[in-house]
Amino acid sequence: MADTGAPGGETLLFLTDEQLRKGIEAMFFAYRGFTADPDRILDQHDYGRAHHRAIHFINREPGLTVTTLISVLGVTKQSLNRVLRTLIDDGLVESRVGRRDKRERHLHLTEKGAVLERELSEAQRVRMRAAYRAAGPQAVAGFRQVLEAMMDPAMRRHYQMLKDAE
């Protein structure tokens, strides 16, 4: 058995159900912490997490098509349209007709949208930076490996495309 060097002599290869349960619970609580600061900001604008995810990925890939955003977010066209309608009406997102295909809609953040995106992202970067510094580089690399291994194959492809675009 490979020892992780973790307190309690936990091993990498043979985790018990109890150890896995603790990991699941840690993910739940970490997610609550990760989303708490942006949630407070979103509440001030009467937005929710769906708005945040849309803003994040539109910022990440300006000109992203609605179809691609639906795929990345794993939502229905109907649910995304409600979110996009709000963001467009509020002046945070612009929808532009495709140059090659007039049926396509390409999404871009406006300056107002970019300001909100920076505020939301900075709130999460502060929390992640502190956690990463506390954990150290090996833990950060291991954490990323675990997250990538947990992704569904389609989501992993989207994630890989974003990484490759850097």
Curated annotation (Swiss-Prot):
Pfam families: MarR_2 (PF12802). InterPro entries: HTH_MarR-typ, MarR/SlyA-like, Tscrpt_reg_MarR-type_CS, WH-like_DNA-bd_sf, WH_DNA-bd_sf. GO terms for biological process: response to stress. Gene3D superfamilies: Winged helix-like DNA-binding domain superfamily/Winged helix DNA-binding domain. Coiled coil: none annotated. It comes from the Bacteria. Keywords: DNA-binding, Transcription, Transcription regulation. GO terms for molecular function: DNA binding; DNA-binding transcription factor activity. The keyword NAD does not apply. Necessary for photosynthetic and respiratory growth. This is HTH-type transcriptional regulator PetP. It comes from Rhodobacter capsulatus (strain ATCC BAA-309 / NBRC 16581 / SB1003).
